Design a protein with these regions (language model features):
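N-terminal, Lys/Arg-enriched amphipathic/low-complexity engagement segments
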Residues: 1-30
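A generic structural signal for residues embedded in beta-strands
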Residues: 11, 51-54, 148
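Short, well-ordered loop/turn sites that connect or cap secondary structure elements
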Residues: 3, 43-46, 140
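Intrinsically disordered, low-complexity linker/loop segments enriched in Gly/Pro
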Residues: 36, 58-142, 147
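Short, Lys/Arg- and Gly-enriched loop/turn segments at beta-strand edges
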Residues: 16-27, 59-68, 154-164, 253-256
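C-terminal alpha-helical interaction appendages
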Residues: 209-283
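Conserved mixed alpha/beta catalytic, RNA-binding, or beta-rich assembly cores of soluble enzyme
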Residues: 108-134, 138-216, 221, 226
Length: 283
């Protein structure tokens, strides 16, 4: 698929892997791709050294989602134990029916969004990459624009892993996973060299930090915020330092890590994804 700057496209995603988990209750019996993405989309005019701006206009959900526990994965692995858990979660106009008693508003978002790296093929599960990937950030939602560094001609955008709702950080390693359609538009920002993704939510600029250990991830995210203020916005170093210290909030991002995991433990993250939020009202 090819798209030009400003084109709006609809990308359908699949939840077949979760259907199979529900039916078979055995991860080894799942034949569908886990965390599949739709794409790639070749964006005309995108070249290495540019940034691809992906604006999320709409996320259409189907009538259900999934709550999944994979044994040994996520922050709740110890209390959940060795048995797989799968729950089909109804979605309707009232919201997301997480339990029989608790219904919460839907807050659809894109868990996996990225462009092709210049090197080897990237995983759609973990880790997160400078070019994006399975970042699992609640900010990748309708109304936001995700900026991704382009490393290959055409950028080659892919999107997947839609969530009906997700707690920030996705500490359990899954959200309420859902099938759906993401409606996005693409633009090319010539010469905007990024070393990690950036998100404009409308109210904030969110800088994604990637590094190992977590302190390195935090430092890199803050450095990118500092470079944005002093380079793109023309602030003095002193002003940028003082305002970041006073007003830029940090938090953990998605749980997928920032470094390729040990092959013997492919779902154990290494490194960290962090987020650094700067209020646009201060620009």
């Amino acid at each position: 698929m090819a798209a030009g700057a400003g084109d709006r496209i609809a990308l359908e995603t699949s939840d077949e892997a979760y259907r199979q988990m529900d039916e078979r209750r055995d991860l080894a019996a799942v034949t569908a791709t886990i965390n599949p993405v739709t794409g790639p989309v070749y964006v005309e005019g995108a070249e290495p050294g540019d940034a691809l701006a992906v604006t999320v206009h709409e996320i259409r959900l189907t009538g259900h989602g999934w709550s999944i526990y994979l044994p040994g994965v996520g922050a709740l692995a110890r209390p959940m134990g060795a048995e797989m858990f799968v729950r089909k979660v109804p979605l309707d106009d009232a919201g997301v029916h997480v339990t029989d008693r608790i219904t919460v508003p839907a807050a659809p978002m894109i868990g996996c969004i990225g462009v092709a790296p210049a090197g080897a093929a990237a995983s759609t599960v973990m880790p997160s990459y400078p070019t994006g990937g399975n970042m699992d950030l609640t900010d990748a939602r309708p109304g936001a624009t995700v900026y991704l560094p382009v490393e290959v001609p055409g950028a080659l955008l892919s999107v997947g892993d839609i969530h009906a709702v997700m707690a920030r950080g996705e500490s359990s390693f899954v959200a309420i996973e859902a099938e759906g359609t993401a409606v996005v538009s693409v633009d090319v920002v010539k010469g905007l060299r990024l070393r990690a993704p950036r998100i404009d939510t409308g109210d904030e600029i969110v800088f994604v930090g990637l590094g190992d250990p977590v302190q390195e991830s935090i430092a890199r995210g803050y450095e990118d915020a500092f470079a944005f203020l002093t380079g793109e916005q023309g602030w003095s170093a002193g002003d940028a330092y003082a305002v970041l210290s006073a007003c830029a909030h940090s938090e953990l991002g998605g749980p997928t890590g920032s470094t390729t995991p040990d092959p013997l433990h492919p779902l154990t993250p290494i490194g960290a994804v962090t987020l650094h939020r700067f209020p646009k009202a201060l620009l």
